[in-house]
Design a protein with these regions (language model features):
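Class I SAM-dependent methyltransferase Rossmann-like catalytic core
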Residues: 1-20
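Short amphipathic alpha-helical surface micro-motifs
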Residues: 7-11, 28-32, 42-44, 153-157
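Exposed alpha-helical structural elements
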Residues: 8-12, 37, 146
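Generic detector of short, locally flexible boundary/turn motifs and exposed helical patches
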Residues: 10-16, 25-28, 135-141, 162
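Alpha-helix termini
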Residues: 14-20, 38-39, 154-155
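S-adenosyl-L-methionine-dependent methyltransferase catalytic module, highlighting the catalytic core
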Residues: 87-101, 105-177
Length: 177
């Protein structure tokens, strides 16, 4: 999924880390193109998009928690607007971390306080492709405090959370220790 504020965050964060992503390996968890995507921001990279169902932007059909590629496979691991639909978001985050190279970056955007529930049977399941197909009727607006149980100071040399009160998004960027 993509919306203006989220796209801007990804673009600014990615450019802050590295001005040229050519020849880099990038993983996107939740890559199904609902209404735009971030893949175009990383021209020349080796880009792998995963999601729960086939569709535009999806290279491999698998959940982020079940992806079992080798440790430190990617220079950048990204998830945009999917953690709020994922009952295993915590484990997915840690799996993305595992697959990110030391000195590489982990970046995510997700819904936070104030965003209306979407992508469930109670709303419009088309807002979260694939989740209903595998039995995930889940929605949670995540907050920075939801990550307190992780020892982020040990996992990352630097990290930052931002909250966008206009779009009701939580943004994260961390450099793997």
């Amino acid at each position: 999924m993509a919306h203006y504020n989220q796209l801007n965050f990804v673009k600014v964060a990615a450019n802050h880390i590295k001005s040229d992503w050519g020849n880099m390996k990038i993983l996107e968890v939740g890559s199904y193109d609902v209404n735009g995507n971030i893949r175009a921001l990383f021209q020349g990279s080796e880009y792998t998009g995963i999601d729960l169902c086939e569709g535009k932007g999806v290279d491999i059909v698998i959940s982020g928690v079940d992806l079992a590629l080798p440790d430190e496979s990617f220079d950048l691991a990204i998830s945009c607007e999917s953690f709020e639909h994922n009952p295993t978001w915590y484990e997915t985050f840690l799996n993305m971390y595992r697959m990110t190279k030391q000195g590489g970056a982990l970046l995510f955007t997700c819904a936070t306080t104030g965003r209306l529930e979407h992508g469930t049977q109670r709303t419009d399941k088309n807002d979260s492709p694939g989740t209903q197909d595998i039995g995930w009727d889940y929605y949670k607006n995540l907050k920075k405090s939801d990550f307190d149980a992780m020892d982020l100071n040990n996992l990352f040399t630097n990290y930052v959370f931002f909250t966008d009160d206009l779009s009701h998004d939580l943004y994260f960027l961390g450099i793997k220790n």
